[in-house]
Swiss-Prot record:
Function: One of the primary rRNA binding proteins, it binds directly to 16S rRNA where it nucleates assembly of the head domain of the 30S subunit. Is located at the subunit interface close to the decoding center, probably blocks exit of the E-site tRNA.
The entry's keywords: Ribonucleoprotein, Ribosomal protein, RNA-binding, rRNA-binding, tRNA-binding
Biological process according to GO: translation
Entry GO MF terms: rRNA binding; structural constituent of ribosome; tRNA binding
CDD domains: uS7_Bacteria (cd14869)
Family annotation (InterPro entries): Ribosomal_uS7, Ribosomal_uS7_bac/org-type, Ribosomal_uS7_dom, Ribosomal_uS7_dom_sf
Organism annotation: Porphyromonas gingivalis (strain ATCC BAA-308 / W83)
Protein name in the entry: Small ribosomal subunit protein uS7
Cellular component terms (Gene Ontology): small ribosomal subunit
Transmembrane segments: none
Length: 158
């Protein structure tokens, strides 16, 4: 265990929307330090979402935020070894980790999707998550189902 907790790095808001969550998402999306490429993919995906949901009263950024909220898990299971047996113990997730998990899942399942460009795949996954569908939403439901099934072991909390 380390002695001092590392300092939180300050993340600057993105240039278009002025939102820190967007920058965090783009940082997860980025490969090999290519941040401009990641930003162009993200903004391209939001443009595609805007064209698909042009009749909605919500903006593309609001749809993205709602999609993230829809795929954010509340509980997860952690392995805990007790007396030779390993139990899956359901635990609450702290807010920063919730946000991180939801962003990583959205990106992971967008990458696994069939489609032309990454912007297309990301836009499709955002729209699905907004409508409570898609692989990222299914992942959240599976996490909740696992926690519910192992609720009997909740007293083994960490």
């Amino acid at each position: 265990m380390r002695k001092a907790k590392p300092k939180k790095r300050q993340i600057l808001p993105d240039p278009v929307y002025g939102d820190v969550r967007v920058t965090k998402f783009v940082n997860h999306l980025m490969y090999d330090g290519k941040k401009n490429t990641a930003f162009s993919i993200f903004y391209g995906a939001l443009d595609i979402v805007k064209t698909k949901h042009s009749n909605e009263e919500k903006s593309a950024l609001e749809i993205w935020k709602a999609a993230l909220d829809n795929i954010t898990p509340q509980v997860e299971v952690k392995s805990r070894r007790i007396g030779g047996a390993t139990f899956q113990v359901p635990t609450e997730i702290r807010p920063e980790r919730k946000e991180s998990i939801s962003m990583k899942n959205l990106i992971l399942y967008a990458r696994k999707r069939g489609g032309k460009t990454m912007a297309d795949k990301l836009a499709a996954e955002i729209v699905d998550a907004f409508n409570n569908q898609g692989a990222a939403f299914k992942r959240k439901e599976d996490m909740h189902r696992m926690a519910e099934a192992n609720r009997a072991f909740a007293h083994f909390r960490f």
